[in-house]
Amino acid sequence: MVASHTVKLIQALEGDAAAIRKLTREAYAKWVPVIGREPKPMTEDYTEAIKKHRFDFLYVNGELAALIETIRCSDHLLIENVAVSPSFQGKGYGRMLMAHADKLAASSNFEQVKLYTNKLLVENVRLYIRLGYSVNREGAVVSGIKGTSLRGA
């Protein structure tokens, strides 16, 4: 018997910064030993970011499971952050959020969606490539971090 899940996507509001921070810190904690420091999303000021960027929450059976942060640029949509709660990872919710970003881009007449990630987050890079993204460039970005820039059509 397959369990049914109620999945809702809701745009976050300015008062949701604490929930964004909590979920993001939980989601990225596993990467601290891999890269030797907290990934950039763990250190962001979400009280300020939510005023400038779009955040969408994904709820599963009423529980906050994941979020995506996007930024409308002049010619593309930038995915700034995708965070999935550890208890919901590996269940396709990150893919759902990536598909949501594609819809947001299309509704803004953008032909591209871009994102940046630390190349040491290998399982994330593999997921993005499976979703149709291609590596645009690699190199040191902010603070000497080895980054990977990906773009999707």
Predicted feature descriptions by range:
Residues M1-A3, G152:
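Acyl-donor-binding surface of acyltransferase catalytic domains
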Residues V2, K91, S107-E111:
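Short coil/turn segments at alpha/beta junctions that flank glycine-rich nucleotide-binding fingerprints
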Residues V2, Q11-N81, S85-S87, R95-L104, ...:
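Acetyl-CoA-dependent GNAT
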Residues V7-L9:
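Generic structural signal for residues in well-ordered beta-strands
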Residues E44-T47, F55-D56, E111-L131, R137-A153:
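C-terminal "cap" of GNAT-fold acetyltransferases
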Residues S85-K91, K119-L120:
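Active-site acidic-Proline motif in GNAT/NAT acetyltransferases
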